[in-house]
Amino acid sequence: MTKTKSKKNMIKRNKMDEKQEKEQLTMKKNKKIFIITFVICISILAIFLVKKTLQNDTFYTIKIGKLILENGIDMKDHFSFHSNLPYTYPHWLYDVFIYLIYLIGGYTGIYISSIVLFLILIYFLFFALYKITNHLSISAFSTFIATLSLSGFVTARAQLVSFILFALEVYFIEMFLKNGKKKYLLFLLLISLVICNIHLAVWPFYFIIFLPYFAEYILSLIVNKKKDNKITLFLKKRFDLDVNSNIKYLFLIMLLSIFTGLITPLKGTPYTYMIKTMMGNSQKYIAEHQMITWSSSPFVIIMIFEVYFLSLFTRVKIRDLFMITGLTIMAVTSIRHISLLALAGIFCFARVFALYFINNNLIIDNTIINFMSRKKSVICTVLVTIMMAGGIYFIQGIKNPDYIDTKTYPVLATEYIKDNLDYKNIRLFNEYNFGSYLLLNDIPVFIDSRADLYTKEFSGLDYDIFDDYKSITKDYQKVLKFYDISHLLIYKQYPGEKELSTFYIILKDNSNYNLLYEDDNFALFEKNNDEDIIITYN
């Protein structure tokens, strides 16, 4: 009787083990289907989100990359007609990279490189978020939010590479705090070195990302050493305040990273660039330095709201709140910081989401995976993604069907100048937005989107070229006389505007300027005589 009962129990256990093993195999299979489906869908979406039309910085990037390979880095400007302006080459390594791609594949190659870099960023985010949260569905959803949030910043600029580097930085910090492996510290040093050479302007943000971790460590030390009171009890209840001794190694690495600024061909520029930029007046004029318009960043708003809202109902890591709060304050002051908020903030977004489900015993990951791995779900998901991507591409194609937007960049006017004028010896006043396109075509410019080059802080001049450009319609005769301008290429109509530009009307009505060329968007004038104006700059 006992043997029979024991045998039955063994059979029952074997059946349970077989059932459990079968469920595990099914779950493993469903996870593979989920991952493959997600990767396909997010890839389709990302590819169609990348704008085909090139941005103005790309043009000077190509030209500077060529200059570096041919002549090296001499810390001088070679493309404006202003004499002996110093130039910092803030993303020299990326310039070389883009020029080499341009040599191989032209504008198409550059467009493809932007897609590839964006895909690398997205794939890595998905991988990193899964490693940190251990929730596949939350990682996928968070990656989707990040893709939409960052898509507006994806273009052939050095920032696209720096996005990948910052994502790596957050991941390496998290992994080091989790398992203490020293290899992550070496990777962090390497990231600092690469940023110094590939996108110098954002190097200070490398150090900013460390700050929430240090703040959490200091607060944890204080709370754990103090006697319990209302404040400490509240903090212990609401936040995970375990003291991680690995933080001291992170602090050491951050200090060592400061010296990576010496390992560049740019001399001491890494230590002065941000200070000079903040002191310069380009902050007043450049769009990416302006205050954020929240209506244009809905997915970032969703991310911020979710972190704060869920932190009310679950115990979270306080570094996530420090990170989100600090980056939100930065984003309010400057649009360029919204990308850093979207990038670093997505790690906080995913972790808070995961902690909410864990702390409230909401086991939904497997349920979502099983549902989304069904045949009908996979087909519907792919079809919806294709429809979304097609709609995005159709809209973008209507707005900007080509690599070069002829309403923004004077393609035909440039051809006219090169065919009819001694273009290398004229002193051409031009608009900021298309100066880079002119210098790509070997036409010396008055100004271009290397904005800092033309401020007093960088030029060392006692007058400000950028200020003079912005005030041109107020006192154009004085400005044109001071810079000995012989020709002017300006917008006849600014992109998106229906009215003629004020400066075009002024010059058209002035008999001292001859209209040499015009089309629907641009006009080229030549000055035909000088006026007696005394020029003084205080």
What are these regions (language model features)?
Residues 461-520:
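Periplasmic/luminal catalytic loop of GT-C fold multi-pass membrane glycosyltransferases
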Residues 45, 149-150, 184-201, 210, ...:
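Membrane-interface alpha helices of multi-pass inner-membrane proteins
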Residues 420-459, 486-493, 525:
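Short periplasmic/luminal acceptor-recognition loop of GT-C membrane glycosyltransferases, typified by
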Residues 53-57, 69-71, 82-83, 200-314, ...:
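Transmembrane catalytic cores of multi-pass membrane glycosyltransferases
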Residues 112-132:
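Transmembrane-helix motifs of polytopic, lipid-linked glycan transferases
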